[in-house]
Design a protein with these regions (language model features):
Chain A
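Hydrophobic transmembrane alpha-helices and immediately adjacent juxtamembrane helices
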Residues: 1-144, 152-263
């Protein structure tokens, strides 16, 4: 209830469990999307660009377009899954269903509710990434053992983008307002974070901007893990970026949600 | 520990510069059914939210089960159940899951939760709808489910914010009976309502608040006796003769233009006098009610 320090305990898992039990009921939808999405991308972009872009230069490697692009499908999905969960879905639970109000009559703090929700968003990212990575593996697009690194990466990325979603949930007055961060933040990241073309193709200033964005680091790590070309430098810089941003934005999201909810 | 489940002392609630609760104090005793009455915007929900630590106090102190709510809210919440004024059921879940999953927030083991859900579904006559989704329920069923959910942790204190608003008379009476049974089992209950008849029937004690302040506190019957008397003469329309008579005799009355209420305390002769001389047909003698007390104390103007 206090306004200052976060009040966190393992009780946040109870919120996570609630979300898990509810989602489990519609597991088929949750399962089919990440199963089919990579297949759609590979067949469309992969076959579509095969003639236009026979191969692509990426950090000194020569890759076919599908091999280059496939890891970005996972990375962008990690971003979208957690962001959507902690923006639209969390807003519905908070604003329309009054789920948070109901839980606040039990021994859980606002911090635990929000942290549980962000953790759930990250879990959804992890589950989707696991399914997508499995599908891509069948096409021979993921190298192992480095490919296993996608799992912790998905969870970390999920925490970060969930926290970003939650930051907007702490402010928006109506659900339509989420279109703004999607248009101004999420979609530009989706297009300019080294997802569909190498960042080297951009002018220098644009590259610098891109490296300031979290998705660029998520894509970079995902790609190098899939290609088996991941370096310690890569892990240190991009992993460090994601971790630092997460450790900054999760507490910020908790704080702003506390401000919104505790009146 | 004292016999008080709730101790409210000089509690204030401010939203920005607006004061919604303005220094109220009251106690709720163990096993009591306590009513919180007041017009729209009086500060009932604001008060209730402070009692279960949902909303921080702007001033004063509040103890529940002997714990200071500001620091001991977790222990307090483990032992109470809340039914909110606005529906907060989980629409994505079935009736049964609403109970069982909510039990999870209290850390109740699954087998125990299932057991309690069975009993609560039966107690509230929902056992045939346990698989239905909340969206399919009628308003009355939803309210029953909301109260059932508030009982999943077997609370010692039940907090009900307008539990019967929007319910048909059948459901309302059925709920009263359930509440009476819970009270017999030793559950302390605090409730808000806009139905004065309900408050009069159910509440051992109540307060009437307005503009964030307590106007009166007491037993429903005592309040009626004190403020309006056992009987009231009501005349509608009002003839001029009656107006004059009332003023001459110095009777306590309320002139609403088309209607007049005369508080005759316990003097039945006044009624016979009035009906003999003035408006025979437009005059009735009726019991004083809590609604009369409420309107007398809080006025007849519309709120908000
Ligand atoms: N979060 C809030 N921010 C600002 N003002 C608020 C807030 N909550 C309540 N108020 C105001 O405080 C006053 C008391 O509100 P409250 O909800 O406690 O009244 P109430 O007695 O429960 O009314 P009702 O019978 O309509 O439910 C009202 O004027 C209301 O507008
Ligand atoms: Mg209210």
């Amino acid at each position: 209830m206090s306004q200052s320090a976060p009040q966190l305990s393992w009780r946040l898992l109870r919120v996570w469990r609630r979300d898990w039990l509810v989602t489990r009921k519609s597991w088929l939808i949750g399962f089919m999307t990440p199963l089919l999405e990579p297949i759609l991308y590979i067949t469309s972009l992969g076959f579509g660009f095969r003639i236009l872009i026979p191969e692509i230069q990426y950090e000194g490697h020569t890759l076919t377009y599908v091999v280059f692009m496939a890891p970005a499908i996972i990375a962008t999905n990690i971003m979208y899954t957690a962001f959507m969960e902690n923006s639209f879905s969390s807003f519905v639970r908070m604003y329309y269903q009054k789920t948070y109000d109901a839980i606040r009559a039990t021994p859980l703090s606002v911090d635990e509710i929000i942290a549980g929700e962000i953790m759930w968003g990250a879990t959804k990212s992890l589950m989707a990434a696991t399914i997508m990575a499995t599908v891509l593996s069948l096409f021979g697009l993921v190298r192992y053992p480095t490919g296993l690194g996608l799992l912790p990466l998905a969870f970390l990325g999920g925490l970060l983008f969930g926290a970003i979603g939650m930051l907007f949930t702490a402010f928006v007055k109506s659900i339509d307002m989420f279109n703004l961060p999607i248009f101004l933040l999420i979609t530009p990241m989706y297009l300019f974070s080294g997802t569909f073309f190498p960042l080297e193709n951009l002018p220098n200033w644009a590259q610098s901007v891109a490296w300031a964005l979290p998705l660029t680091h998520l894509v970079s790590l995902a790609r190098n893990l899939c290609l088996g070309t991941v370096s310690w430098m890569n892990v240190l810089v991009s992993g460090g970026y994601l971790l630092a941003a997460t450790m900054l934005l999760v507490p910020l999201a908790l704080r702003l949600m506390r401000r919104r909810l505790i009146q | 520990m004292s016999d008080n489940v709730i101790e409210v002392r000089e509690v204030q609630k401010r939203y920005g510069t607006f004061t919604a609760v303005d220094g109220i104090s009251f106690d709720v005793k163990r096993g009591e059914l306590f009513g919180l009455l007041g017009p729209n915007g009086a500060g009932k929900t604001s008060t209730i939210r402070m009692i279960y630590g949902f909303s921080p106090l702007s001033g004063g102190s509040l103890r529940v089960f002997g714990h200071d709510i500001t620091t001991g809210w977790r222990d307090v919440r483990a032992r109470l159940g809340v039914c909110h004024q606005e529906d907060s059921l989980d629409e994505e879940m079935s009736v049964r899951d609403n109970l069982e999953i909510f039990a999870g927030f209290f850390g109740i083991p699954r087998a125990v939760a299932r057991d309690r859900a069975n009993r609560l579904l039966e107690f509230f006559g929902l056992e045939n709808r346990e698989k239905a989704s909340v969206r399919e329920l009628s308003g009355g069923m939803m309210r029953r489910l909301a109260i059932a959910r508030a009982l999943i942790n077997e609370p010692d204190l039940l907090i009900l914010d307008e539990p019967t608003t929007g319910l048909d008379p059948q459901t309302r009476h059925q709920l009263w009976e359930k509440l009476a049974r819970l009270k017999n089992q030793g559950v302390t209950i605090i409730l808000t309502t806009h139905y004065m008849e309900e408050a009069a029937q159910l509440c051992d004690r109540l307060i009437i608040v307005d503009h964030g302040k307590i106007l009166v506190e007491g037993r429903p019957r005592d309040l009626v006796a004190q403020f309006v008397g056992k009987q009231i003469i009501e005349s509608s329309p009002v003839c001029e003769g009656l107006r004059r008579f009332v003023t001459e005799r110095g009777l306590e009355h309320e002139d609403l233009g088309h209607r007049m209420l005369i508080y005759c305390k316990d003097d039945e002769n006044i009624y016979h006098e009035i009906t003999k001389t003035y408006c025979q047909d437009n005059c009735i003698l009726r019991m004083g009610t809590l609604e009369d007390v409420f309107l007398k104390l809080t006025g007849r103007e519309l709120r908000e």
